[in-house]
Amino acid sequence: MRVMGVDPGLTRCGLSMIESGKGRQVIALDVDVVRTPADTPLQKRLLTISDAAEHWMDTHRPDVIAIERVFANQNANTAMGTAQAGGVIALAAAKRDIEVHFHTPSEVKAAVTGSGRADKSQVTEMVTRILALQAKPTPADAADALALAICHCWRAPMIARMAAAEAMAEEQRRKFQAKIKAARG
């Protein structure tokens, strides 16, 4: 499975591409950070991010895109910009019929470090080890994008099992409702 990891942001938007293998084997294919100046109009910044993400999608052909879920407990302006950046990337994926999954920061940290409360340096260190990189990815947005892709590779089987279980439960509920309706006649 080929996963594009996205650490959304207006000033710096991390993009990564990971290929998963057997078990927990993951290989880094590419990583970059798209930068937009704060003094550039919002629509131009979003266009720059969208263009870069679309180029990545068309070049690398990911099977799925993993985007960090935004929380509003940050600065409101920062949260809004981060959500907008993630939104244009999700839209670009939808236009290409690429599945999108959102992961919380604590899910990502727990997946790569074992602790949902890990700091950025711990995440960067583990990403470097997991991917057997020669140097730590910089800036932190690059490491976070890689961590998001790793997280999705490792969580995807569980996500698929949960979706299958939910579908089965819904089918059983539907059949039960049909039986009740038939019995009432």
From Swiss-Prot:
| A GO term for molecular function | magnesium ion binding
Q: Which residues bind Mg(2+) 2?
A: E68
* Active site positions: D7, E68, D141
**Where does the record say this protein resides?**
Cytoplasm
Q: Relay the cofactor remark from the entry.
A: Binds 2 Mg(2+) ion per subunit.
- Per the UniProt entry, the Enzyme Commission number(s) are 3.1.21.10
* Major subcellular site: cytoplasm
What this chain does, per the record? Answer: The RuvA-RuvB-RuvC complex processes Holliday junction (HJ) DNA during genetic recombination and DNA repair. Endonuclease that resolves HJ intermediates. Cleaves cruciform DNA by making single-stranded nicks across the HJ at symmetrical positions within the homologous arms, yielding a 5'-phosphate and a 3'-hydroxyl group; requires a central core of homology in the junction. The consensus cleavage sequence is 5'-(A/T)TT(C/G)-3'. Cleavage occurs on the 3'-side of the TT dinucleotide at the point of strand exchange.
Q: How does it assemble?
A: Homodimer which binds Holliday junction (HJ) DNA. The HJ becomes 2-fold symmetrical on binding to RuvC with unstacked arms; it has a different conformation from HJ DNA in complex with RuvA. In the full resolvosome a probable DNA-RuvA(4)-RuvB(12)-RuvC(2) complex forms which resolves the HJ.
Q: Protein name, please?
A: Crossover junction endodeoxyribonuclease RuvC
Q: What is the lineage of its organism?
A: Bacteria, Bacillati, Actinomycetota, Actinomycetes, Mycobacteriales
Q: Which gene encodes it?
A: ruvC
